[in-house]
Amino acid sequence: MPAIVIVGAQWGDEGKGKATDLLGGRVDYVVKPNGGNNAGHTVVVGGEKYELKLLPAGILSPNAIPIIGNGCVVNLEALFQEIDGLEARGADTSRLRVSANAHLVAPYHQVLDKVTERFLGSRAIGTTGRGIGPAYMDKVARLGIRVQDVFDESILRQKVEGSLRQKNELLVKVYNRRDIIADEIVEYFLSFAERLRPLVIDSTLELNNALDEGKVVLMEGGQATFLDVDHGTYPFVTSSNPTAGGASVGSGIGPTRISRSIGIIKAYTTRVGAGPFPTELFDEMGVYLQKTGGEFGVNTGRPRRCGWYDAVLARHASRVNGFTDYFVTKLDVLTGIEQIPVCVAYDVDGVRHDEMPMTQTEFHHAVPIFEYFDGWTEDITGARTLEDLPENARNYVLALEKLSGTRFSAIGVGPDRDQTIVVHDLIND
C-alpha cells in the first residue's frame, strides 16, 4: 500500500491530531516526520483529552506503530516525561520507536533559544523557547548530535565538545551568560541511554519494508504549511519543512510512494506568535472564536490569534502540498454567528490578488476581500452526513470547498473522533 501524509494547511493547530487519531485504527504505522516538542496537538478519545507534544497522535491507536522520524529533533527528557504521563493514564506506549538518525535537542539549545528571543526584543519570532530552532541550526551546520550518538560515548563527547566551542563563545561574549560544561551535557545524554536503546530503529528501512508488505503508513506532519521555512511567512516560521515534501524527507519514504496528501484546515483561521495574518480579528468576535474554539496553545498556553477563513491561503497550501483532500475541522465553533465572512482575495495597495502575493512586503500589506455567508444556530455536533447539516452550514462548507480548489473529504463537527462527517474515505476513496 502507498503512504498517506497529513499536513496542516494554515499556521498550525488545525486539528491534525484528530485526523490522525480518526485514521489510526486503519493504519499500521504513524510517523512524525518533522518538528519536536514545540508543536502540541490535542486528541479526544471517549471524552478523554490527551495533549501530545513530541509523540505522534498514533500513540493512542492500539494497532498502529508510532515512529518519531529522522526529520524530528528530540528532547529526551521531554520524550520520557510524555511517555510516563500517558502510561500513568493507562495508555500503552510500548510500540513507540525512534529513528536512529533523528537529532537531539541539548540543554544548550534551549538556553540559546531563550536568550536569543530576549535579545531580539520587539523583533522576536515568538518561538516556544524549547530549543527547536537551534537544534535544527546545528543539524544544518553539521554540528548536531543524533540519537545513535548516545550509544557511543567517544563520538558523543567529541560532538558535544565541538559544538560547545562555538556556543560558549556566543553565550559568554555576546549574551553575558556562563559557559556550559561539556561533561555535564555528555552525562545528561548518557543518563537516557539504557531506556532509549530498545526504542531505536532504522526507521527508513522499517517503513519501506512495511510498504513493500502492503501495510499502510500515515505520516503526521507537525506545524503547518505557512510555518514552513521555505513556503511559509518567512521569517515568522519554524525551522523545518512541515509540508508534504518535508514529510518524505523526514521519514525516508520516497515521494512516489505517497498516494494521498491530506490538508487539515479549520473552518476559520488561527495563528500563534508573531507574523502577518490578513484576516485577524481584533474585536469581540476574535475573543469569541478564541473562547468558543478553546484557542490556547497546548505547549505554551498562549492565546491563539483568531480570524476568518482565508481561501487564498487554502488554495496556496493545496498547490504547495499537492493536496488530494481537505479535512475541515471546528465547523461547530461557528454555530451562532449571524454572518460569516470568508476571504476570497487580497487588496494590496489597490491591486486585487487572487493568489498569494510574491513578496513578504506585499503580504504584510494584504487587506482581505470578503464574501459573506449566512450563519446557522442549530447544534451540528450530531451531524454525520452533509445532509444532516442545516442548509446554511452546508452552503458554507460547499462554498469553502469551491473556493479552496480541493475536495472536502471530512468535516469535523466536534472535538471527539466520532464527531466527523466523512464525505470521501480518506484511505481508499
From Swiss-Prot:
The record's NCBIfam families line, in alphabetical order, gives:
PRK01117.1, purA
Q: How does it assemble?
A: Homodimer.
Cofactor binding note from Swiss-Prot or TrEMBL: Binds 1 Mg(2+) ion per subunit.
Where is this protein found? Cytoplasm
What HAMAP family would the database entry show? Adenylosucc_synth
Summarizing the function annotation, the protein's role is: Plays an important role in the de novo pathway of purine nucleotide biosynthesis. Catalyzes the first committed step in the biosynthesis of AMP from IMP.
Listed binding positions for substrate are 298-304
- Positions bound to IMP: 13-16, 38-41, 128, 142, 223, 238, 302
Q: What is its main location?
A: cytoplasm
Keywords (alphabetical) are: Cytoplasm, GTP-binding, Ligase, Magnesium, Metal-binding, Nucleotide-binding, Purine biosynthesis
The yes or no answer to whether the keyword Magnesium is present is yes
Active-site residues?
13 (proton acceptor), 41 (proton donor)
The pathway this protein participates in, as annotated, is: Purine metabolism; AMP biosynthesis via de novo pathway; AMP from IMP: step 1/2
Q: Which major enzyme category is it?
A: ligase
Q: What is this protein called?
A: Adenylosuccinate synthetase
Q: Which family does it belong to?
A: Belongs to the adenylosuccinate synthetase family.
This protein's record includes keyword Metal-binding? yes
Single GO MF descriptor = GTP binding
GO terms in the biological process aspect are: 'de novo' AMP biosynthetic process; IMP metabolic process
Q: What EC number(s) does the entry state?
A: 6.3.4.4
Q: Which reaction does it catalyse?
A: IMP + L-aspartate + GTP = N(6)-(1,2-dicarboxyethyl)-AMP + GDP + phosphate + 2 H(+)
- Amino-acid positions noted as binding GTP in the UniProt annotation, renumbered to this chain: 12-18, 40-42, 304, 330-332, 412-414
